[in-house]
Amino acid sequence: MSEQRVFKHPCQFLTWNSKHNYIVCCSGPYLLGFSCSTGEKIFEHCYRDNINEKHREAAAYGEAIRQVAFSKDYSRMATVSEDKCLRLWDSTQPDKIELLYQKNIPKRCADLCFAGSNEIVFGDKFGDVYCVDENWFTTSEVTEEKKSNVVEGKQEPVNNDTLKDSKLQKLEPIMGHVSILTQLIVAQNPQNSKEEIIITSDKDEHIRISRFPNAFVIEGFCLGHEDFVSRMSLYDNRTLISGGGDNHVFVWDLENFKCLDAFDLRSAFSTYLSLNQPMVVSVILPIFKRQLVAFACEGMAGLIFAKVTPEKRLLFHSALKLSGPVLDAVLLDTDTDQILISLDSSFTFGACFECVKFDEGNAAVLTKPDVIKRIESDGLISTEKPFCPLAQIHTLRKNHSKFIRSVETGTSSPSVESKDN
């Protein structure tokens, strides 16, 4: 029997704390923080179980961290894992991340974010959306004695049995979809800067815009997708870009909910990269200062860059080949617009990260700063197999989707009338 190869476990989720200039990497059940200046690991948190080895893999999957969000002032960080545990952290000091509370939520979380007044907004796989504040954590048995401090990268023991015994407080949703929720965004209302809206998407091609926190008041819908919506991102406070199981990504005006453009992403990928499978959009990353948007698709080793015109149309800009499938991408510096890309090293046994910078001609160029090399070599977790499934978005596609049939039969892909070119 051949020996299993040891590799650095990839990061399924990335986010950047711009106030303190560090990145948070979710690597299976590990929550890792690294300084963007030095590459030093500033904190590490992981579930530590006492069960025997044959159940350890299942435990690691259950503790896989799927989402991380920071409050607007970066004083709080929220994380949620596969085992439906919502955690709230004090992130005031980057070298001393303190776990304040953790509490189970009724169903598995699909996405979460912070609202402007520091409430945590999260949606579950059944389509319900909830809004809680810090006081919600204290309504059960979670108390000061159940905290865990991460000091200088070392975690103090947590009494997990006691924490899991906390009674679940009855939660009432502020809104709901009749389908699996895929993403949510709380943003400034483009028609009234003093108000907020909540944008939600689901498996059944819907994008809904509602008032926040009075989400029962629906402002409108952005309709045009023909398959599930997996990713949304704000280009500015009135322009939304969305993608999913379609061959196109869409640009929406949030003031009148009209489609401004439908950009043929499949053609962009198929021209420059090998593509013989249905597309699933996994990353939409606006680079506002350069009037660009970067797109990645699940399982594909490349990025597509599109130019945003003044009329909010998308025009093909460039394609960039990478050394492995993209898992996530995040802007590391809004001054230089450097992009950090997480790669699925469980396939390539190679690099976990690649970086993109832009030259004077606005062309995307691959680079690997020493800081990122240090994070990759010294900071990531070594393993012989993935702790958890890393690519899951494609499971949202329905078996009767025409985007599957068009690939299987070799026919031309379904088209959407586009306003570009």
Swiss-Prot record:
The keyword RNA-binding does not apply. Pathway: tRNA modification; N(7)-methylguanine-tRNA biosynthesis. Keywords: Nucleus, Phosphoprotein, Repeat, tRNA processing, WD repeat. InterPro entries: Trm82 (IPR028884), WD40/YVTN_repeat-like_dom_sf (IPR015943), WD40_repeat_CS (IPR019775), WD40_repeat_dom_sf (IPR036322), WD40_rpt (IPR001680). Pfam families: WD40. One of its GO terms (biological process) is tRNA modification. It is found in: Nucleus. Transmembrane segments: none annotated. PROSITE patterns: WD_REPEATS_1, WD_REPEATS_2, WD_REPEATS_REGION. It comes from the Eukaryota. The modification Phosphoserine is found at S413. The keyword Methyltransferase does not apply. One of its GO terms (cellular component) is tRNA (m7G46) methyltransferase complex. WD repeats lie at residues 60-99, 176-222, 224-264. Required for the formation of N(7)-methylguanine at position 46 (m7G46) in tRNA. In the complex, it is required to stabilize and induce conformational changes of the catalytic subunit. Belongs to the WD repeat TRM82 family. Forms a heterodimer with the catalytic subunit trm8. This is tRNA (guanine-N(7)-)-methyltransferase non-catalytic subunit trm82.
